[in-house]
Amino acid sequence: MLAKRIIPCLDVRDGQVVKGVQFRNHEIIGDIVPLAKRYAEEGADELVFYDITASSDGRVVDKSWVSRVAEVIDIPFCVAGGIKSLDDAAKILSFGADKISINSPALADPTLITRLADRFGVQCIVVGIDTWYDAETGKYHVNQYTGDESRTRVTQWETLEWVQEVQKRGAGEIVLNMMNQDGVRNGYDLEQLKKVREVCHVPLIASGGAGTMEHFLEAFRDADVDGALAASVFHKQIINIGELKAYLATQGVEIRIC
């Protein structure tokens, strides 16, 4: 059995790490490189960096900090933000990133997933999915351009359909960003994760809602996700990664102990 992964998420805007609630009202957390180094030293299994306004601004992720991160950490990291071409991806990987993640650009051009997978291998192609639960319809819908409130829109894709589509096209991993839960720290959306797990045959990463160590345990135990991504509980030092991993190990979760 592969070890479960703990993945701090760093949302980047204007060269700094920020964090919002339900993808809105972002506050500045701190500088990118020191935070990345801290999380690596605490025992994170990998890091994810989202340049949250790159796609909505029509630009590629700011590459200046990618190489600096690569110099100070010795764990894998993934970079996302406005990657719309093979050249964009190649540059980010050449600066030291281990994986690239696409989200809004994949919705705009689903063939991008296949082209990236064919060129670089499925192991480094992650597809992020921003999913919103509509209480009126009882359905989960994929959203696009979520880094900019004024441009965020609901797509024609229902979440389960898009999960299956991106796998067919070559996604090597899926990060499910559950927007309703984002930043509120009352637990992952386990029901949604279970439904996605049934149709997801590549590694699945839960994102949005972690507030306690028990929330991580529930995601691993009840929804069988491969990794759990979180931001505010780590940024605000509510949970220490080393202590979290020790707790999960006592609960029988296969985890890499620091």
UniProtKB/Swiss-Prot annotation:
Catalytic activity: 5-[(5-phospho-1-deoxy-D-ribulos-1-ylimino)methylamino]-1-(5-phospho-beta-D-ribosyl)imidazole-4-carboxamide + L-glutamine = D-erythro-1-(imidazol-4-yl)glycerol 3-phosphate + 5-amino-1-(5-phospho-beta-D-ribosyl)imidazole-4-carboxamide + L-glutamate + H(+)
GO biological process, one term: L-histidine biosynthetic process
Enzyme Commission number(s) of this protein: 4.3.2.10
Source organism per UniProt: Escherichia coli O45:K1 (strain S88 / ExPEC)
Function per UniProt: IGPS catalyzes the conversion of PRFAR and glutamine to IGP, AICAR and glutamate. The HisF subunit catalyzes the cyclization activity that produces IGP and AICAR from PRFAR using the ammonia provided by the HisH subunit.
GO molecular function per UniProt: imidazoleglycerol-phosphate synthase activity; lyase activity
Name listed for the protein in its UniProt record: Imidazole glycerol phosphate synthase subunit HisF
Gene: hisF
Subunit record text: Heterodimer of HisH and HisF.
UniProt keyword terms in alphabetical order: Amino-acid biosynthesis, Cytoplasm, Histidine biosynthesis, Lyase
InterPro entries attached to this UniProt entry: Aldolase_TIM, His_biosynth, HisF, IGPS_HisA/HisF, RibuloseP-bd_barrel
Family: Belongs to the HisA/HisF family.
Pathway: Amino-acid biosynthesis; L-histidine biosynthesis; L-histidine from 5-phospho-alpha-D-ribose 1-diphosphate: step 5/9
Subcellular location field: Cytoplasm
One GO term describing the cellular component: cytoplasm
Stored CDD domains: HisF (cd04731)
SUPFAM superfamilies in the record: Ribulose-phoshate binding barrel
Enzyme superclass (EC): lyase
Pfam families reported for this sequence: His_biosynth
Entry annotation: catalytic residues: D11, D130
